[in-house]
From Swiss-Prot:
The complex is composed of two ATP-binding proteins (LolD) and two transmembrane proteins (LolC and LolE). It is found in: Cell inner membrane. One of its GO terms (cellular component) is plasma membrane. ATP binds at G42, A43, S44, G45, S46, G47, K48, S49. Its EC number is 7.6.2.-. Pfam families: ABC_tran (PF00005). Residues 6-226 form the ABC transporter domain. This is Lipoprotein-releasing system ATP-binding protein LolD. One of its GO terms (biological process) is lipoprotein localization to outer membrane. GO terms for molecular function: ATP binding; ATP hydrolysis activity; transmembrane transporter activity. Keywords: ATP-binding, Cell inner membrane, Cell membrane, Membrane, Nucleotide-binding, Translocase, Transport. The lineage of its organism: Bacteria, Pseudomonadati, Pseudomonadota, Betaproteobacteria, Nitrosomonadales. PANTHER family: IMPORT ATP-BINDING PROTEIN, LIPOPROTEIN-RELEASING SYSTEM ATP-BINDING PROTEIN LOLD.
Length: 226
């Protein structure tokens, strides 16, 4: 039986706009198993990114519970929540958010450096992961010297360098051309299978979503089978 890495129940989020409460998520139930790959699709503005932020402990739900490796991140102090996030999760976004003044290997090593891993070890582990994503020849290059696909591969390396239990990816290929998007998506699936890391991807691309183990659609604030 697959263990559950990430779970939420009755998850809801309401935003205040002027004097009106606007519910974005109503009652979301989800369980992500070890090494499972899951795609969440839905219309623009349906709340996909909001859901990912709640699952990652980056935003606070209005109601409901989240459990990451059996721990409720919202019952922890801010420092404890950051530690849990940094050890258990990796994040990939549509825009790479790489630090322009640092090289590819330094960017990929950043989560380890934040965890106070010795710099030499952090860089060695980052170089190993960059090799796995086909960027051995780009270690010393800064983001401005890389193509869009290469920058996104560095972002993926940064997400997996800590060997997280789960990767949360928000439109990771949305800013790439079709061929590059295909390559990046295949890379994420390969790392998912080889490392046994769970993968939750928010995407508008139904073709890419179909290549995941499971697909769900966010409609009217709830998840449905796609």
């Amino acid at each position: 039986m697959n263990e559950t890495v990430l779970r939420c129940s009755g998850l809801g989020k309401t935003f205040r706009q002027g004097k009106v409460d606007v519910p974005v998520l109503r009652s979301v139930d989800l369980a992500v198993g070890t090494a499972e790959s899951l795609a969440i699709v839905g219309a623009s503005g349906s709340g996909k990114s909001t859901l990912l932020h709640l699952l990652g402990g980056l935003d606070t739900p209005t109601r409901g519970d989240v459990a990451l490796l059996g721990k409720n991140p919202f019952a922890l102090s801010e420092a404890e929540r950051c530690r849990l996030r940094n050890t258990a999760l990796g994040f990939v976004y549509q825009f790479h958010h790489l630090l322009p003044e640092f090289s590819a290997v330094e960017n990929a090593a950043m989560p380890l450096i934040i965890r106070r891993v010795a710099r030499a070890e952090a860089l060695a582990r980052a170089a190993e992961v960059l090799d796995a994503v086909g960027l051995t020849h780009r270690l010393a290059h800064r983001p401005g010297e890389l193509s869009g696909g290469e920058r996104q591969r560095v972002a993926i390396a940064r997400a997996v360098v800590t060997r997280p239990a789960c990767i949360l990816a928000d439109e990771p290929t949305g800013n790439l051309d079709h061929h590059t998007a295909d390559t990046v998506f295949d890379l994420m699936r390969e790392l998912n299978r080889k490392q046994g890391t769970s993968l939750v991807v928010v995407t508008h691309d139904v073709e890419l979503a179909a290549r995941m183990d499971r697909q769900l659609r966010l409609v009217d604030g709830t998840l449905q089978a796609a």
